[in-house]
Amino acid sequence: MAFDLAARLAERRAADLYRQRPLLQSPQGPQVVVDGQPLLAFCSNDYLGLANHPDVIQAWRAGAERWGVGGGASHLVIGHSTPHHQVEEALAELTGRPRALLFSTGYMANLGAITALVGQGDTVLQDRLNHASLLDGGLLSGARFSRYLHNDPASLASRLEKATGNTLVVTDGVFSMDGDCANLPALADVARARGAWLMVDDAHGLGTLGANGGGLLEQFGLGVDDVPVLIGTLGKACGTSGAFVVGSEELIEALVQFARPYIYTTSQPPALACATLKALELLRKDTWRREHLAALIRQFREGARQIGLTLMDSHTAIQPILIGDAGRAMALSRKLRERGLLVTAIRPPTVPVGSARLRVTLSAAHSEAQVQLLLNALAECYPQLESADA
């Protein structure tokens, strides 16, 4: 048989790398039902607790009554409705950029932006730990592709010396598996000095960072001249779905003309855009959500330190517990689930071999008591894992 899929699947099972889809049988929130089991979840990207907010739900209902269900066509045919346009205007205002362009998913936004901006004869340089969609965009662009050392401006500068054609430097804002933040001011300086453009995917920073929720760039005070291409997602802190690119008038017009993932797909349901508008309003107005989330992050890190857990250098909602071996990470995840807690084990190839981890994600919807329940369970389960290895 030409395609021996059974052997590939068996090999993945044997390496403790087999993935399965848990079945969510409740709305998003800290308290969920998964595969029939009530659980306290610490693995959602609903950072501000907006995915099940009653005002956002009502906005979707009202949007469906006014605009119907489907987008009907691509944006360039007859699928670009008033709610879509209003979301783009709100996103441009939130991020302090001239214009925004709405995409159906973050993956499509990253592929669309990179492949529209660089091609054969050009160069794309990426952080080694970038999200898969960024790496795929670089590979598919046809440009000369290279990765610099993680969050290392000197490594980037060295690779820029060999760059040809138009050069795009691409980085995550908040790295999704480590939770650390890119040194954007230094990366922007290096890129600008060599005539390159910096593109930042701030999927995990938007909404959670910055005084107004504008993300990591707002926190650093960086403008469109520092970061010409900014990507954000709407399915995380915003609680809905979709993604966007913000930047100059010329950038957005270029993407409308050349970004194939934008051109050749049906637009999102207009009702979804109505829900997103309400979520963006809450994201900006409810500053207590960011303040509460920051307090939970401090609580978790201090508690984890007392237990003796190995954490990554993260002060964001993503708090990975480094385990190392994939089998041990799975074992700890199972022990927590037996105690009613859902924390996902992240294994290769998502992370490098030998760096499997439990990826704890915190939300403004969590309470201090719920975070303490997680810490108590970790204090009980982690020593059991260590003693089993002894």
Curated annotation (Swiss-Prot):
One of its GO terms (biological process) is biotin biosynthetic process. The lineage of its organism: Bacteria, Pseudomonadati, Pseudomonadota, Gammaproteobacteria, Pseudomonadales. CDD domains: KBL_like. Substrate binds at R19, H131, T350. One of its GO terms (molecular function) is pyridoxal phosphate binding. The keyword Ribonucleoprotein does not apply. The modification N6-(pyridoxal phosphate)lysine is found at K236. It holds the Pfam family Aminotran_1_2. Belongs to the class-II pyridoxal-phosphate-dependent aminotransferase family. BioF subfamily. Pyridoxal 5'-phosphate binds at G106, Y107, S176, H204, T233. It comes from Pseudomonas entomophila (strain L48). This is 8-amino-7-oxononanoate synthase. Homodimer.
